[in-house]
UniProtKB/Swiss-Prot annotation:
Single GO cellular component term: cytoplasm
GO biological process: L-histidine biosynthetic process
Keyword Protein transport part of the UniProt annotation: no
PANTHER family noted in UniProt: HISTIDINE BIOSYNTHESIS BIFUNCTIONAL PROTEIN, HISTIDINE BIOSYNTHESIS BIFUNCTIONAL PROTEIN HISIE
Gene3D superfamilies referenced in this protein's UniProt entry, alphabetically: MazG-like
Keywords, comma-separated and alphabetical: Amino-acid biosynthesis, ATP-binding, Cytoplasm, Histidine biosynthesis, Hydrolase, Nucleotide-binding
Compartment(s) where it occurs, according to its Swiss-Prot or TrEMBL record: Cytoplasm
Pathway: Amino-acid biosynthesis; L-histidine biosynthesis; L-histidine from 5-phospho-alpha-D-ribose 1-diphosphate: step 2/9
Descriptive protein name: Phosphoribosyl-ATP pyrophosphatase
Alphabetical list of InterPro entries matching this protein: HisE (IPR008179), PRib-ATP_PPHydrolase-like (IPR021130)
Residues in coiled coil: none
Catalysed conversion reaction: 1-(5-phospho-beta-D-ribosyl)-ATP + H2O = 1-(5-phospho-beta-D-ribosyl)-5'-AMP + diphosphate + H(+)
Species whose genome carries this gene: Dechloromonas aromatica (strain RCB)
Matching Pfam families: PRA-PH
Amino acid sequence: MSTHDILHRLSETLASRRHADPEKSYTAKLFSEGPDSILKKIGEECAELIMAAKDGKRLNIVWESTDVIYHVLVLLAFYGLSIEDVSQEMRRREGISGIDEKASRGTK
């Protein structure tokens, strides 16, 4: 199974949980609490990933990276986006210098 397959399947599963019972689904609970709750979890998981990386513990880095990716996918699904949207943007940027790509976006 490819990385794309597992992320695509997870993305679809998360979207399907949007209207599930928040008492029975952690994902549904996050959706029901809204973007602030999802963003808070992303921040917490990013901090845990940073600490795992600082400690150099490879297995913890994998675990925390998984948590970050999961919560980012929840955020995408909350806004009606998926890993496919991110993949399209990554394909668009492929082969472009990061400096050039950032400059092409202009000011926000």
